[in-house]
Amino acid sequence: MKMDHILVRYGELALKGKNRGHFEKLLLANIRHVLKPFPKVQAKRTFGRIVVELNSTDHEPVAAALANVFGIQSYSLALRVENELEAMQKGALFMLTQHPDAKTFKVSARRAYKLFPIDSQSLNHKIGSYVLKAFTGELAVDVHHPDVNVVVDVRESGTYITAGVYAGAKGLPVGSSGKVLHLLSGGIDSPVAAHMLMGRGAEVEMLHFHSPPYTNERAKQKVIDLTRELTKFGRTITLHFVPFTDIQTHIHKEVPSSYEMTIMRRMMLRIADRIARERGILAISNGESLGQVASQTLASMNTINEMTNLPVLRPLLAMDKETTIAYAKRIGTYETSILPYEDCCTIFLPTDSKTKPKRDRSAHFEQYVQVEEKCREAIAGIESLEVTGAHTSPTLDQLF
């Protein structure tokens, strides 16, 4: 015998009423995306859950991939047997042998297939008695707090036997809450913010500003690698590279150093706003944390936000750096984030940035920056990639 299936249970999406079918289809598509490295594995939607058929594939890497998918409340390794009492008894016994340290157990039979002639209570008794006899005193029944709960789920297509529940990523399926344009730097914070948004069902498109030759190809590859790391949580991610050298050098030359960072951030948000509108995206997001640096004070955010009337989402707003670092380590982005390659936010870094920049002063300094011309040139030079877990490729629909 071999555990040949994984049963996937839904989280919040089960509460979505009339939209449940749409959410289930999204979750199934996201599951199939993360299972692409396993060509024999199939995922199907059936009887209120998703069943993953392993087809002789080792269950451990498949289960590890499923553990990252948002929208999964929990999952269980399962043995499928025919709808026959003897097969159920032997299957339950096999599943208990996978828990050698267990001292107590219970059997929980669920007879969804009502034409099966033995009712649930009788199944509990017949299967439990068989297991007790086989273990000859090594196991005891505990119906309240068992070490192992053997669930026998009788369906028309067969009986699925499980003996353990593993926590999923929970949340909502990526893509179920719409699309967000996320400003991705090469640092620790922004990948964490993107992950948090994905957990609430947002599909993220990444926007990165790079400034060659001040930022090199290794810095660019670092951003691709961070994006690729995030694809394991649901789906392919579109990544846009915006050429920012000309804008940045122009600002450095024409704007007082105390306002340099503010004007740079305003230009970034202007460009992000235009890209988002072009692509039908309803919100912009970033990895800012309140008070962390000069550009992330309330006054700075207020002045910078003037460049868009789209919502600017900041999932990390109230998180401290230590918490964010721990989060980055947990999701696997930390080691890439700390690679020592500069991004555009670390070059020409002024030491006297205003913590309370004014909107009118910012607008005054922007008169010397040729805002419209520079924005158009930057958008015209965008490079877009589709990033998957395996590779990247140019986007098929070139919008810029």
Swiss-Prot record:
Every THUMP domain range: 60-165
Reactions mediated catalytically: [ThiI sulfur-carrier protein]-S-sulfanyl-L-cysteine + a uridine in tRNA + 2 reduced [2Fe-2S]-[ferredoxin] + ATP + H(+) = [ThiI sulfur-carrier protein]-L-cysteine + a 4-thiouridine in tRNA + 2 oxidized [2Fe-2S]-[ferredoxin] + AMP + diphosphate; [ThiS sulfur-carrier protein]-C-terminal Gly-Gly-AMP + S-sulfanyl-L-cysteinyl-[cysteine desulfurase] + AH2 = [ThiS sulfur-carrier protein]-C-terminal-Gly-aminoethanethioate + L-cysteinyl-[cysteine desulfurase] + A + AMP + 2 H(+)
Record-given protein name: Probable tRNA sulfurtransferase
Gene behind this protein: thiI
Amino acids binding ATP: L183, L184, H208, F209, R265, G287, Q296
Pathway linked to the protein: Cofactor biosynthesis; thiamine diphosphate biosynthesis
Similarity comment: family membership: Belongs to the ThiI family.
Organism: Shouchella clausii (strain KSM-K16)
The organism's place on the tree of life at top rank: Bacteria
Top-level class of the enzyme under EC nomenclature: transferase
